[in-house]
Amino acid sequence: MATTTDKQVSPTSPSFVYNLDHEDRNTSLKSGRAVLTDFNEQQFVKFDKGCSIETLLKERTSFIDQLLKKIWEHFFSKDECEQLTLVAVGGYGRGELQPYSDIDLLILGENFIELQPKIVEFITYLWDIGFEVGHAVRNLEDCIEAGREDVTTATNLLEARWLAGNYEQFLSLQNLFNLKSFWPSHEFFQAKLEEQEKRHKRYNDTLYQLEPNIKESPGGLRDIQTILWVAKRHFGASSLQELMQHNFISLQEYKEIQAAYLYLNRIRFALHRLKKRHEDRLLFDHQQQLAELLNHDDRPEHNDSIKAVEAFMKPYYQNAHIVARLNEILLQHFKEEIYHFAEDKIEPINPRFRIINNYLDVVKENLFAKNPTALLEIFIIIENYQHLIQGIRSRTIRLIRNHLHLIDDQFRSDPINKALFIEIFRQPKGVNAAVKRMYAYGILGAYLPSFKKITGLMQFNIFHAYTVDEHTILVIRNLRRFFIKQHAYEFPTAHQIATQLCKPEILLLAGLFHDIAKGRNGAHEKLGAVDAKAFSQKHNLNKNDTDLLSWLVLRHLDFSYVAQKKDLSDPEIIQQFAEKVGTQQRLDYLYLLTLADVRSTSDEVWNDWKNQLFLQLYHNTTQALDSSSSQPRDRVKQAIFNKEKASELLKKRGLIPMHFQGFWQAFEQTDFFNRQSAAEIARITRVLFEEDHEAINIHLQPTTSRGATELIIYMHDRDYLFAQFTQIIDKLDLNIVEAKIYSGEDDMTLVIIYLLNRESTSITDPMILTEIEETLKHQLFLKDDTMPPTQPEPRRIRVFEMPTHIQFQEINEELTELSISTKDIPGLLAKIGQAFKSCKIRVHDAKINTVGEKAEDTFMISSTTNESIHTRHSQEELKQALLNNIEQ
């Protein structure tokens, strides 16, 4: 028996036409839904068999045209059809319908009052059989008026296509629309340009986001459509082929953009087919499913599935890059044509380059062919003349792209070219603008083959929002911002350090090379350091600069690791880090590189808490490197130093030792005095002295110098307190970023916790602060240790599979450092706390670090008798309890 996929589904089939006229509306609707569903399934089968996307789109447009005409004829008599016109507009008008795309319709006429009920029935029927309908009912005058007021409406009319009804009315609409007074070419161009700029800004002006929108992101289908809209308004050209006839696009450019157009449409079709609904976002889970659907995943292992996603996304980024570059070239070309000056304003620069109407241009078209070095020289000119240059003329961009093949081994070995490349990074201004264009036009990838390998290389995790190459360009941008006075307010310390560097170019080159070895087998920081050293030697950098550059690439992960995972109040940890860094110069460069690196991963990664951690590590290490500093270098001296300073601060507030001596003595044997700063010790002491003591004392400091809300709990000692307060705070939907627990000799416990809300900011709302205090007091009194209900995993977290890694390191006879690396699931800390409780573990310190979908938490723990967890049996027991709770 034949199925719907074995024979051609047709809206003109007798059964559909018969059921359309059926007196039972349900029968009619059922038939309409069936013919639409069957057609979709038929197209999906063809798609899976490799049918071209061009054929599928044309077939879909033709099918929907026929279906709508039949439905139109059912609802309107011949006489009524003469009064109305059914017009396809928007994406449907240009014949670009995906399986679950909206269909945009215009019903045109002059007198709708009598026919209004039938129009409503017609549109309702379309909705009821499964169409998503966007429609407007207007007369000619209303159409033109609406189009004049809104460029989006005007653009929809630009793609109007007659379907049924009065054809003369449609021609009248076209004639009115084609009048030059209706959106003059230059006004339409400017409006579409502004529209595109706003759209790009919504996607951070980058096509290299890890979850792009196939349609709306830079380099997406909308960028191609913008070219065609402008071309149609200016030339009347309705296709890319016609643009070739007007000499606005070369044959090679046509082939590139047409191939990209078909590729993006194929991915979009696959996404609709996969999700069974309108969807244009390439979300992480979609990428995995599409990689499998499109045969990029024929290996079941976890690591290979990640490689399959990366293999699927790389051609997406390559095609989006082609679209973005050709969009830039063609819109610039249109601009030069549409805004043609009667007399060009020409300013010579040298025999090779000139500025025409504020746009940089070559003097002769054969410049790059005769003098390939000019491919680098042009970027020096961009830097030096940035105050006069708005951009590059379209023909010059084309010439750069067409001569990339000249950048070969001979070019790279030329002493002049090597010197020019370094000089680009040495310029006092315009480096970011130059490097962005070198990247966009393919110069960076051509000059540095290792950079070309990371172009379009995605990083399948939440921590990184961009591909490796785009992240690298953002790092260079953020490094440059440290030097600019107007941006000094963002990072005052970084600005002060940057402006005193002797060799800013080494810092920028470190940014260029820090991730250049990603995607290779091996530690990318080690492989990248080898690349950086080879580059330095080839480009004749002196030994000091070579050593500094390769060291920065090798150690670019160290600063962030120590800042976010180690106890920065421990002078021994600081001393160890200072010894690894070696000099203040290296520390300055490393701090700036790390700051720019982390800031360039994602907008969601950076917050005030991390900023303060970085500053604390920088300042503490600076003091450790200073041989004349009086800063203590061990824990005992640190505690004495902090107590003396805290006493001085308390004395200024009217408190003398007799007021707080008992409190201090109770915590003498803890790490309280060497792990809290003198200012913190003084403030905590004053808070506890001034407040009336209760069984459970809670104090909240909304904002602190640490960039987080401080929560102080002072109460009678209790086993498994960590398990209890982590559960309470998890119920309050807050994040713990650090917790310190001090058990005093007077049977009192002091807990200091630093909190952030889900937006990674301090908690300042008085109502929320009151709720936190009241909830904590109530729950701690109850000694409630029931696990909170587990929240579902967020969509972006759920897609990732991640093994849990647990490591133990004995610090001394009393303490063990426990490191847990796992997926950042909801309620993670509460689950860890429960495992501690079941294994009778006491927590002294917790440092919580979330990196995208990954949690990297460090705990200082002991037994309830204050002994380290050193036996293999006790470690294995705790490890198993943690795994059971985390992975259940």
UniProtKB/Swiss-Prot annotation:
Reaction catalysis annotation: [protein-PII]-L-tyrosine + UTP = [protein-PII]-uridylyl-L-tyrosine + diphosphate; [protein-PII]-uridylyl-L-tyrosine + H2O = [protein-PII]-L-tyrosine + UMP + H(+)
UniProt cross-references to SUPFAM superfamilies, sorted A to Z: ACT-like, HD-domain/PDEase-like, Nucleotidyltransferase, Nucleotidyltransferase substrate binding subunit/domain
Superkingdom of source: Bacteria
Region (Uridylyltransferase): 1-348
Residue ranges of domain ACT in the record: 710-787, 817-888
Domain HD: 468-590
Cofactor entry: Mg(2+)
GO process annotations (BP): regulation of nitrogen utilization
E.C. no: 2.7.7.59, 3.1.4.-
Activation and inhibition: Uridylyltransferase (UTase) activity is inhibited by glutamine, while glutamine activates uridylyl-removing (UR) activity.
InterPro entries per UniProt: ACT-like_dom_sf (IPR045865), ACT_dom (IPR002912), HD/PDEase_dom (IPR003607), HD_domain (IPR006674), NT_sf (IPR043519), PII_UdlTrfase/GS_AdlTrfase (IPR013546), Polymerase_NTP_transf_dom (IPR002934), UTase/UR (IPR010043)
Annotated stretches, region: Uridylyl-removing: 349-709
Gene3D superfamilies reported for this sequence: Beta Polymerase, domain 2, cca-adding enzyme, domain 2, Nucleotidyltransferases domain 2
GO molecular function annotations of the record: [protein-PII] uridylyltransferase activity; phosphoric diester hydrolase activity
A Pfam family of this chain: HD
Keyword list, A-Z: Hydrolase, Magnesium, Multifunctional enzyme, Nucleotidyltransferase, Repeat, Transferase
Primary role: Modifies, by uridylylation and deuridylylation, the PII regulatory proteins (GlnB and homologs), in response to the nitrogen status of the cell that GlnD senses through the glutamine level. Under low glutamine levels, catalyzes the conversion of the PII proteins and UTP to PII-UMP and PPi, while under higher glutamine levels, GlnD hydrolyzes PII-UMP to PII and UMP (deuridylylation). Thus, controls uridylylation state and activity of the PII proteins, and plays an important role in the regulation of nitrogen assimilation and metabolism.
Family of the protein in this entry: Belongs to the GlnD family.
Domain notes: Has four distinct domains: an N-terminal nucleotidyltransferase (NT) domain responsible for UTase activity, a central HD domain that encodes UR activity, and two C-terminal ACT domains that seem to have a role in glutamine sensing.
Protein name: Bifunctional uridylyltransferase/uridylyl-removing enzyme
Organism: Hydrogenovibrio crunogenus (strain DSM 25203 / XCL-2)
Gene: glnD
